[in-house]
Regions:
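C-terminal non-catalytic alpha-helical accessory regions
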Residues: 1-166
């Protein structure tokens, strides 16, 4: 959700979450602030990460689609794996574009230039197009997109009451 990118503090993420999940880096909100203040960046950067994820998705799809012609056994299982790679890529594309749109919104918060908000709109529209492709690829095959069916789980969204378990519901 866009609000998780432009205001992550609203979601009361426990303080050690980022430190425990990977190498040092910056949240998008920190990245944009440092850009505006002309401060040096530290560690992994949000725009680099989303670019890498898109690249990995493209490579995964190219490799598995190329391998498809050579599959002679376990074709159904291979088809599921192939679908996984296409899902990964669509999610990567959707998230990449959403991060770029969120960057524009954060730029607006700093500079008050309405052109930043205008520039965010097509990025979000493209992000939604890729998300809809993800939904289509997972509609009959995937459940528990939010990974936990509890009220305590808030990221990406709560799963209490058996809701928000598929990509379509989210």
């Amino acid at each position: 959700f866009m609000s998780q990118l432009v205001n992550p503090y609203k979601y009361t993420i426990y303080p050690g979450f980022y430190e425990s999940c990977g190498p040092e880096g910056e949240k998008l909100i920190e990245y944009v602030e440092k850009e505006w203040k002309k401060q040096p960046h530290v560690g992994e950067l949000p725009l680099d990460i989303v670019a890498q994820v898109v690249e990995h998705g493209d490579k995964a799809v190219a490799a598995i689609d190329k391998a498809a012609a050579a599959v002679t056994r376990n074709k159904e299982e291979f088809g599921r794996l192939q679908n996984d790679m296409h899902c990964y890529r669509e999610f990567a594309y959707a998230f990449n574009l959403k991060v770029k749109a969120a960057q524009r919104v954060l730029n607006y918060q700093w500079g008050k230039d309405l052109n930043e908000l205008d520039a965010a709109i097509p990025l979000m529209e493209q992000s939604l197009d890729h998300y809809r492709k993800l939904v289509a690829l997972t509609d009959s095959t995937y459940y528990y997109a939010n990974s936990m069916q509890t009220a305590q789980r808030r990221i990406p969204i709560g799963g209490d009451g058996g809701k928000n378990k598929t990509w379509k519901e989210m």
